[in-house]
Amino acid sequence: MTRLQNIYREQVAPVLQKEFNYKSSMQLPKLEKISLNIGLGEASQNQKLLEEAVKELTAIAGQKAVITRAKKSIASFKLREGMPIGCRVTLRGDSMWDFLDKLMNFALPRVRDFRGIADRGFDGRGNFTLGIKEHTIFPELEVDRVDNPKGMNITIVTSAKTDKEGKFLLDKLGMPFKK
């Protein structure tokens, strides 16, 4: 069991149950998965860029990244159906908890001029999406060896029914939201 899982079970779960008046511990919102996505528009022309992104995302997540392909052809983007356009990873279980711990305690504080995350990333159902401009904030990547920094989307999927429950859960776990 990871450090963050212990915090959830021992500190966050009792507070959640009290705050939202849940009758059973099975009603408590919990983390289901974390999805990491790098979208590369230039990947259709530059295969080396895509291979580099897959290698870097695999290093960040600790799990092999899957190449995403275009669902539709779009002529103005010179894109054909089935062309590679990015990569993604879905984390669950212990690797999800480890990644969230690393994100909150190591990666986000390394962002330049970091003052907290805006809470606008909630989708209405308790899930939170966060965009990162440079993926070099993660400790697994050496800034000198990365040729071109890439942006990245991180989606934290919870079993919460509302944004209020989801934000409360992430806040108690230690997500650095703006005050």
UniProtKB/Swiss-Prot annotation:
Keyword Ribosomal protein on entry: yes
GO biological process: translation
GO cellular component, one term: ribonucleoprotein complex
Keyword Nucleotidyltransferase recorded: no
MF terms in GO: rRNA binding; structural constituent of ribosome; tRNA binding
Family of this protein: Belongs to the universal ribosomal protein uL5 family.
Function in brief: This is one of the proteins that bind and probably mediate the attachment of the 5S RNA into the large ribosomal subunit, where it forms part of the central protuberance. In the 70S ribosome it contacts protein S13 of the 30S subunit (bridge B1b), connecting the 2 subunits; this bridge is implicated in subunit movement. Contacts the P site tRNA; the 5S rRNA and some of its associated proteins might help stabilize positioning of ribosome-bound tRNAs.
Subunit structure, interactors included: Part of the 50S ribosomal subunit; part of the 5S rRNA/L5/L18/L25 subcomplex. Contacts the 5S rRNA and the P site tRNA. Forms a bridge to the 30S subunit in the 70S ribosome.
Name of this chain's protein: Large ribosomal subunit protein uL5
The encoding gene: rplE
